[in-house]
């Protein structure tokens, strides 16, 4: 089961993806798939995007390699309120829809030839996690704590 009960967010098991980030690093991006509810016209609560059993966590400076691809995808339509967002925010929530993830993944895959073996493994693991998460949702909320 990929989803926890909405009250069990403390049971999440973050997958920490590291390339060069030191173990003591605290600045990070968390990737939380949104659990879509059957209730129409309701705004998702914090619990709806903190109930995926194995969310992804990437620390600074490792997320810098990804942020450049996020920036290329903007402007996007924010999935939380359907307003246009001009830029990716490493300090706050970014509600990214499946179509935008597909663009981001494509742009990474086109560039894979330019990376070292370790960087390719990092990026391919990221792509695999996003692709798997998108089997269960159409929105992934990326939260930064910078």
PLM features: residue spans?
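Acidic (Asp/Glu-rich) sequence patches and key acidic residues
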Residues: 1-136, 145-146
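Conserved GNAT acetyl-CoA-binding A-motif
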Residues: 140
């Amino acid at each position: 089961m990929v989803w926890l009960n909405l009250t069990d967010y403390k049971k999440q098991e973050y997958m920490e993806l590291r390339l060069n980030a030191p173990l003591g690093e605290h600045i990070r991006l968390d990737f939380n798939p949104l659990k879509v509810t059957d209730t129409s016209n309701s705004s998702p609560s914090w619990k709806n995007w903190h109930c995926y059993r194995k969310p992804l966590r990437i620390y600074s400076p490792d997320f810098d390699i990804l942020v450049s691809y996020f920036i290329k995808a903007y402007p996007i339509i924010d999935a939380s309120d359907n307003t246009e967002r001009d830029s990716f925010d490493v300090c706050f929530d970014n509600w990214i829809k499946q179509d935008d993830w597909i663009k981001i993944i494509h742009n990474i895959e086109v560039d894979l030839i330019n990376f070292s073996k370790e960087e390719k493994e990092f990026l391919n693991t990221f792509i695999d996690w996003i692709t798997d998460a998108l089997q269960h949702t159409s929105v992934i909320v990326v939260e930064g704590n910078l």
